[in-house]
Amino acid sequence: MSWIIFYTVIAALLVLDLGIVHKKNTVMSFKESVLFSLFYFVIACLFGIYFYYNTGAEHAREYYTCFLIEKAMSLDNIFVISIIFQFFKIPGKYQHRVLFFGIIGVIIFRAIMIYGGTILINKFAWLLYIFAVILIATGIKTFYVSHKTFDIQNSYIYKSIVKNLNITPNLEGDKFVVKRNNKLYFTPLFISLVLIEAIDLVFAIDSIPAIFAITNDVYIIYTSNIFAILGLRALFFCLAEIVERFSYIKYSLALILIFIGFKIFIHHYIAIPAYVSLIVTITLLLFGIIASIIRKNMIDH
């Protein structure tokens, strides 16, 4: 029943998104982007309340912790998506269409990764320690790397697509595929969609281990993942500016990853409750936001 409720909510949001709000190809304004993202955030928070009343406070805390971590870890994804759109010269009026269909892929591929990860961890518990090492290493690396980059032309995926598929040199309106001389040709819109899906899988390799350190409940992990990503896609059109403004969030995220990594190593000796993980996550993110605001004000003045 819980899965039916979740997928009903997601289906309704997707129909509202593309079928009503963005039925025509138009560029989303900054204000619309913020309002739509806030709408998704409220829905995600309400789903946490659903957890609270149906499965208890502990599950609700785990859900909110997973949601915040996934939200923070997905920020770099925005920069890579922006690079892809710039490379293929995708106009703003078509970007939302690509992001929308990208969500469909995310819903499918994240389900496979999370379900597969749960099976592996239940069978090989020691995998969590490998995840812990990855998280600590990623956290330390985050201190020294500004943003993740993506060399499109030299990527294996791009080379494979160009080599094996018929590609149109230019966009064909909002179409992903066109037919010419009884042959299918794929447009730059399609290639950008495939690359965005591939990049999401790469970023998921970083974020999903962090979530498994909080809980091994598939429903909590999956729902928090999807709601976090839905909100970020809605905020894409203004997020680059916001992330630049909150430049210290990456350091908060680095500390969160290191904290989660150590939490895995010590869980046999000290059990850290879900509410502590939630408090640590919120506190570190708030420190990052406040420090960024103070820094921005000092630079402006």
From Swiss-Prot:
<feature type="transmembrane region" description="Helical">
    <location>
        <begin position="220"/>
        <end position="240"/>
    </location>
</feature>
<dbReference type="InterPro" id="IPR022369">
    <property type="entry name" value="Integral_membrane_TerC_rswitch"/>
</dbReference>
<feature type="transmembrane region" description="Helical">
    <location>
        <begin position="101"/>
        <end position="121"/>
    </location>
</feature>
<feature type="transmembrane region" description="Helical">
    <location>
        <begin position="246"/>
        <end position="266"/>
    </location>
</feature>
<keyword id="KW-1133">Transmembrane helix</keyword>
<dbReference type="InterPro" id="IPR005496">
    <property type="entry name" value="Integral_membrane_TerC"/>
</dbReference>
<keyword id="KW-1003">Cell membrane</keyword>
<keyword id="KW-0472">Membrane</keyword>
<feature type="transmembrane region" description="Helical">
    <location>
        <begin position="33"/>
        <end position="53"/>
    </location>
</feature>
<dbReference type="Pfam" id="PF03741">
    <property type="entry name" value="TerC"/>
</dbReference>
<feature type="transmembrane region" description="Helical">
    <location>
        <begin position="124"/>
        <end position="144"/>
    </location>
</feature>
<feature type="transmembrane region" description="Helical">
    <location>
        <begin position="72"/>
        <end position="92"/>
    </location>
</feature>
<feature type="transmembrane region" description="Helical">
    <location>
        <begin position="1"/>
        <end position="21"/>
    </location>
</feature>
<feature type="transmembrane region" description="Helical">
    <location>
        <begin position="185"/>
        <end position="205"/>
    </location>
</feature>
<comment type="similarity">
    <text>Belongs to the TerC family.</text>
</comment>
<protein>
    <recommendedName>
        <fullName>Uncharacterized membrane protein RF_1252</fullName>
    </recommendedName>
</protein>
<keyword id="KW-0812">Transmembrane</keyword>
<feature type="transmembrane region" description="Helical">
    <location>
        <begin position="270"/>
        <end position="290"/>
    </location>
</feature>
<dbReference type="GO" id="GO:0005886">
    <property type="term" value="C:plasma membrane"/>
</dbReference>
